[in-house]
From Swiss-Prot:
Its main location: mitochondrion. It comes from the Eukaryota. Belongs to the PPR family. P subfamily. It is found in: Mitochondrion. Residues 1-11 form a transit peptide. Keywords: Mitochondrion, Repeat, Transit peptide. It comes from Arabidopsis thaliana. PPR repeats lie at residues 167-201, 202-236, 237-271, 272-306, 307-341, 342-372, 373-407, 408-442, 443-477, 478-512, 514-548, 549-583, 584-618, 619-653, 654-688. NCBIfam families: PPR (TIGR00756). The lineage of its organism: Eukaryota, Viridiplantae, Streptophyta, Embryophyta, Tracheophyta. This is Pentatricopeptide repeat-containing protein At1g22960, mitochondrial. Pfam families: PPR, PPR_2.
Length: 718
């Protein structure tokens, strides 16, 4: 024992010969702060000090020249440091004069399986590194502490006796780690603690969390962080304002957008190129083309170089409203400015033409492109599939493979979706297998599409089998995959199992579902007639920090209309307008169709008029909804006039338009009109489907139907 003490004393003298007076003061400060040992007799205190000195000297003398931990260090050698966090803290403070070595040793300690973890030890290590500006190393230590679930470490930094500047430096670092790990809730908790105790986070960290909240669609919380910044004097930068503008556009809060850019002007913060592009893109996506145009002009007058990225949102905004002449006008402006349309520009046109049923124009545009890409083909394939033209989509797929363009996962997923929609689930499964031979492996979207197909077909056992295969392949289901399964359970009437899946998703992903998942869940509840639960979910969206969008409202409005609750639907529509959530063309379709189906044709036309007044351009769906109402009411002559009006407005009728007229003429036994309409469909290359044939021959016995279709088409072709 005496020999041991002599060795310890010798080690102590050796170590203290390298220390300075200032460092000794630091040691005293740290030993006092973290020590939880009782104040023992002098001999006990001396023995403890000798032990600390022994370990400190051992670490310093054996660390080696490498930046890596010494391979000769062993857990047996440092057993006491592994099991006694207080001793470890005191030893770390004794070697704080060599922070790199302290970090290497601490790193080594963390790799040992039997180490006893301590928040205080992590806090001590973080302070040593921060005092020496070793912030990269400090980041790794902070990340490790968070991975271990030591989220209360911020309490030690805030409430302990740390130097305030060092504490703020480390608190900012913890916030940075939280944002890098997308742990928005944990960030907000630390952020609020800091503010309450007078520790103001850096604007850089505030900007990062604003982006995380924006990307998570947690707009209410983003606004709260922004307001807190302003209230406590954290000066916002152009990045702050850009992020908030983007958040407000995504939430559809255009009134707040105006307040934010005016606040930028008031603070004399100059708009950047990014600011202008956010404003142009945001107003264009929300159909506010006059405002988008104004900021585009301001951008050019401010001397910023305009690029296709500045013009493309304008083109897309006009195209979404079917204003193709205005869109081509923007393209002419591009050319006059010496800027050539990009492949993305052409893809915008292809997508819009498909959306408006002008599939032949879209195909012609693709053929005229010098360098179409896989997105060009995928977009047109999707357009064909939406129109039920799977043969044309397959031929386009063959064209793609015949060229130098390689199909992507999106290509296969688009085709699989088309096969599922047409009920060809075996073909969809075969295409999934074919993908792997091309070294394109199914992803969560592939499997979810198949699950959705089987659910829609009522085959829940196969849906479950495909879902389980996805899990066996190690593919993690996303929110949409969980929701697709839940919708299947809802369709079978098992709402309890559906909500268990909801809880499983939250438990697995460790975060609340996003707005899309809530919208799909509300849709499923509406479809099974559970409006009370749907409304409950809609209100819950606010409580979890999300903002309902036009999709949320449209879904519940449809539920009310399908249940004949027209007043409740109108109230919800008015609430949308009060909240400055602008109804989309889908919202108006739901309102028009819901009233037309119930024989409330006058109200349906009122919504059509209101839609146009609000600058929302009708599409073939809204026109068909009115056409359906006229046919249902027996106003066949008015329906014909309306069909002509559609074509005059540049919206060509589709197979559903003709099918409704064919069906009503069959009811009136106007067979010449029926044949004329059917021939007109074929002449326009509008492919009749099963619905058309059922309408055409609904007064015949079922076994005569196929022969009559064959006879009619031979007659027309001759």
């Amino acid at each position: 024992m005496i020999l041991c003490l002599r060795l310890c004393l010798r080690a102590s003298r050796s170590f203290f010969s390298i220390s300075t007076t200032n460092n000794n003061n630091n040691l005293s400060r740290f030993l006092f702060r973290f020590s939880t040992l009782p104040h023992c007799a002098a001999s006990s205190s001396s023995s403890s000090s000798n032990l600390e000195s022994y370990y400190a000297n051992l670490i310093l003398s054996s660390h080696g020249d490498s930046n890596k931990p010494n391979r000769k260090w062993s857990s047996h050698q440092f057993r006491l440091l592994l099991t006694d966090p207080n001793l470890l803290i005191r030893v770390l403070n004794m070697i704080r004069v060599k922070p790199e070595i302290a970090f290497r040793f601490f790193n080594w300690i963390q790799r040992q399986s039997d180490v006893k973890q301590s928040r205080q030890a992590f806090a001590a290590m973080l302070e040593i590194l921060a005092e020496n500006d070793l912030m990269s190393e400090a980041y790794l230590v902070a990340e490790r502490s968070i991975d271990l679930g030591m989220h209360e470490i911020d309490d030690l930094l805030i409430d302990g006796s740390f130097d305030k500047l060092i504490a703020l430096k480390l608190l900012d670092l913890l916030l940075w780690v939280y944002t890098k790990k997308s742990m928005a809730e944990k960030f907000l908790l630390s952020f609020e603690k800091m503010i309450r105790k007078g520790f103001l986070p850096s604007v850089r960290n505030c900007n990062i969390v604003l982006k995380v909240l924006r990307d998570s669609r947690m707009m209410n919380k983003a606004s709260a962080v922004y307001e807190t910044m302003i209230e406590h004097g954290i000066m916002p930068t152009v990045i702050t304002f850009n992020t908030m503008l983007d958040s407000c556009f995504k939430a559809g809060d255009l009134e707040r957008v105006d307040k934010i850019w005016l606040e930028m002007k008031r603070r004399n913060i100059e708009f950047s190129e990014v600011t202008y592009n956010i404003l142009i893109n945001g107003f264009s996506k929300n159909g506010k083309m006059e405002e988008a145009r104004r900021f585009h002009g301001d951008m050019r007058r401010s001397g910023f170089a305009v690029t296709p990225y500045s013009f493309n949102p304008l083109i897309e905004g006009y195209c979404k409203q079917g204003l193709f002449d205005d869109a081509w006008g923007v393209t002419d402006e591009m050319l006059n400015a010496g800027i050539y349309p990009t492949t993305s520009t052409y893809n915008i046109y292809i997508c819009a033409l498909c959306d408006f049923g002008r599939i032949d124009d879209a195909r012609e545009l693709l053929s005229s492109m010098a360098a179409p890409d896989v997105v060009s083909y995928n977009t047109l394939m999707h357009g064909y599939i939406k129109m039920g033209k799977f043969v044309e989509a397959s031929l386009l797929f063959d064209d793609l493979r015949a060229g130098d363009i390689h199909p992507s996962i999106v290509t296969y997923n688009t085709l699989i979706d088309g096969l599922c929609e047409s009920g060809n689930l075996e073909g969809a499964q075969r295409l999934k297998e074919e993908m792997t031979t091309q070294l394109i492996f199914p992803d969560v979207i592939t499997y979810t599409t198949l699950v959705k197909g089987f659910v829609k077909n009522g085959n829940l056992s196969m849906a479950t089998e495909v879902y389980d295969e996805m899990l066996r392949k190690g593919i993690k289901p996303d929110g949409y995959a969980y929701t697709t399964r839940a919708v299947g359970e809802l369709r079978l009437g098992d709402s309890d199992k559906a909500f268990r899946l909801h809880e499983e998703m939250v438990a697995t992903d460790h975060h609340a579902p996003d707005l899309t998942i809530y919208n799909v869940r509300i849709d499923g509840l509406c479809k099974v007639g559970n409006l009370v639960k749907a409304i409950e979910f809609q209100r819950k969206i606010f409580r979890v920090g999300l903002v309902p969008d036009h999709v949320t409202y449209t879904t519940v409005i449809r539920g009310y209309l399908e249940n004949g609750q027209f007043k409740m639907a109108r109230n919800l529509y008015d609430e949308m307008l009060r909240k400055r959530l602008y109804p989309s063309v889908i919202t108006y379709f739901v309102l028009i169709y819901g009233h037309a189906k119930a024989g409330r044709l006058e109200q349906a036309f009122q919504y059509s008029t209101e839609m146009k007044k609000r600058g929302v351009r009708p599409n073939v769906m809204t026109h068909n909804a009115l056409l359906y109402g006229m046919c249902k009411a027996g106003n066949i002559d008015e329906a014909y006039r309306y069909l002509c009006k559609m074509e005059e407005e540049g919206i060509p009728p589709n197979k559903y338009s003709y099918t409704m007229l064919i069906s009503k003429n069959c009811d009136f036994e106007k067979w010449e009109e029926v044949v004329k309409l059917y021939k007109e469909m074929l002449d326009k290359e509008i492919e009749p489907d099963g619905y058309t044939h059922r309408a055409l021959f609904k007064h015949l016995e079922k076994d005569h139907e196929s022969r009559e279709v064959e006879f009619l088409e031979r007659l027309l072709l001759s």
